[in-house]
Amino acid sequence: GWRDWLKKAGGWLKKKGPGILKAALGAATQ
């Protein structure tokens, strides 16, 4: 169900979130 997906997404964001934010900020400032 979507709750399982949310749990997976939450765990993934905890691991990958900082890097994604840095990449997004880098792209936005270019």
Curated annotation (Swiss-Prot):
GO cellular component: extracellular region
Keyword match Chloroplast: no
Main location group: secreted
Location relative to the cell: Secreted
Alphabetized UniProt keyword annotations: Antimicrobial, Secreted
Tissue specificity statement from the Swiss-Prot or TrEMBL entry: Expressed by the venom gland.
Stated role: May have antimicrobial properties, like most ant linear peptides.
Family in the record: Belongs to the ponericin-G family.
Name of this chain's protein: U1-poneritoxin-Ni3c
Organism: Neoponera inversa (Ant)
